[in-house]
Curated annotation (Swiss-Prot):
Name the record gives this protein: Small ribosomal subunit protein uS17
GO CC, any one term: cytosolic small ribosomal subunit
Gene: rpsQ
Functional summary from the UniProt entry: One of the primary rRNA binding proteins, it binds specifically to the 5'-end of 16S ribosomal RNA.
Pfam family, one: Ribosomal_S17
Lineage start: Bacteria, Bacillati, Bacillota, Clostridia, Peptostreptococcales
Database matches in Gene3D superfamilies: Nucleic acid-binding proteins
One of the GO biological process terms: translation
GO molecular function: rRNA binding; structural constituent of ribosome
Keywords recorded for this protein, A-Z: Ribonucleoprotein, Ribosomal protein, RNA-binding, rRNA-binding
Length: 84
């Protein structure tokens, strides 16, 4: 029997100032319930970057994991696109 699926998100790194931690901004479009307009919503997640390989501006894929600290609930899966 398989446990629940883990959430996977793709976003941009907005901060890498902490050791082994990055802040990833994930954008999504949601439909307004009354006006039916698509609204862009941005949410920030702290993610575990074990090897400190990410820089600001990188597109990364993060996956939900067990709580690693007070705020960290995601870990880095891969760097989709490096910033130039």
């Amino acid at each position: 029997m398989e446990r629940g699926r883990r959430k996977v998100r793709i976003g941009r790194v907005v901060s890498d100032k902490m050791d082994k931690t990055i802040v990833v901004a994930v954008e999504e479009f949601v439909r307004h319930p009354l006006y039916n307009k698509r609204v862009k919503r941005t949410k920030k997640f702290k993610a575990h970057d074990e090897k400190n390989i990410c820089n600001i501006g990188d597109r990364v894929k993060i996956m939900e994991t067990r709580p690693l600290s007070k705020d960290k609930r995601f870990r880095l899966v891969e760097v989709v696109e490096k910033v130039k």
